[in-house]
């Protein structure tokens, strides 16, 4: 089980990313537009750098919905490998069966 503070930190990051998503997209569009002048690009880069560090989506960490474990989390299920195995053995995950050959 992950510390409660780490789980809270991730939820706070998710809210920050959501809050600044439109502004980041707007600034990145200016930067990536080839028709923008050098001054516009420069100002957009400075504004982008002044946004909070946690506003970047790449700083988010996928965590298990049950335990909060940060590693070995399957995107499709949102569970870590341990809890996914337990859920599959109980039959809680529809369509997922243990391989046998």
From Swiss-Prot:
SUPFAM superfamilies: Glucocorticoid receptor-like (DNA-binding domain)
One Gene Ontology term from the biological process aspect of the record: translation
PROSITE patterns reported for this sequence: RIBOSOMAL_S14
Keyword set, alphabetical order: Ribonucleoprotein, Ribosomal protein, RNA-binding, rRNA-binding
Molecular functions per Gene Ontology: rRNA binding; structural constituent of ribosome
Cellular component, GO annotation: cytoplasm; small ribosomal subunit
Pfam families: Ribosomal_S14
Assembly, per entry: Part of the 30S ribosomal subunit. Contacts proteins S3 and S10.
Family annotation (NCBIfam families): PRK08881.1 (NF006477)
Record family assignment: Belongs to the universal ribosomal protein uS14 family.
Stated role: Binds 16S rRNA, required for the assembly of 30S particles and may also be responsible for determining the conformation of the 16S rRNA at the A site.
Name by which UniProt lists this protein: Small ribosomal subunit protein uS14
Organism of origin: Saccharophagus degradans (strain 2-40 / ATCC 43961 / DSM 17024)
Lineage, broadest ranks: Bacteria, Pseudomonadati, Pseudomonadota, Gammaproteobacteria, Cellvibrionales
């Amino acid at each position: 089980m992950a510390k409660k503070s780490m789980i809270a930190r991730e939820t706070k990051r998710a809210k920050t990313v959501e809050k600044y998503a439109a502004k980041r997209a707007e600034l990145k569009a200016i930067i990536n537009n080839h028709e923008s002048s050098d001054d516009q690009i420069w100002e957009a880069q400075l504004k982008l750098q002044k946004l909070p560090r946690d506003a970047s989506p790449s700083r988010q960490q996928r965590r298990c919905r049950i335990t909060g474990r940060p590693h070995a989390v399957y995107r499709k299920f949102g569970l870590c490998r341990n809890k996914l195995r337990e859920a599959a053995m109980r039959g809680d995950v529809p369509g997922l069966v243990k391989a046998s050959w």
